[in-house]
């Protein structure tokens, strides 16, 4: 988590510098690499949260999408 915050802080620092005075080519590359890494981690975390999700209707019947159920079965998270 601390690494994510450091990465995010550096992305923001480079964004402020880009608006204020511009970035060197090296800083532009660094910013893009940091953004790509951050987005990769974010997407992975989000996917994990969605894969753990179970959806129920008002009557209490599970209505989790089949695609999510299949992924949960593959990962051993579901017995049915």
UniProtKB/Swiss-Prot annotation:
Region entry Disordered, spans: 59-80
Pfam name, any one: DUF896
Keywords, ordered alphabetically: Cytoplasm
Localization of this protein: Cytoplasm
Tagged with keyword rRNA processing: no
Stretch forming the signal peptide: none
InterPro entries listed in its UniProt record: DUF896
UniProt GO cellular component terms: cytoplasm
Family the UniProt entry places it in: Belongs to the UPF0291 family.
Protein name: UPF0291 protein LCA_1274
Provenance organism: Latilactobacillus sakei subsp. sakei (strain 23K) (Lactobacillus sakei subsp. sakei)
């Amino acid at each position: 988590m601390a690494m994510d915050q450091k990465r995010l802080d550096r992305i923001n620092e480079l964004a402020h510098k880009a608006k204020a005075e511009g970035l060197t080519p090296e800083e532009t590359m660094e910013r893009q690499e940091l953004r790509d890494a951050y987005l990769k981690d974010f997407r992975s975390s989000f996917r994990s949260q969605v894969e753990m999700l179970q959806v129920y209707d008002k009557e209490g019947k599970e209505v989790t999408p089949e695609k999510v159920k299949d992924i949960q079965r593959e990962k051993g998270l579901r017995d049915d």
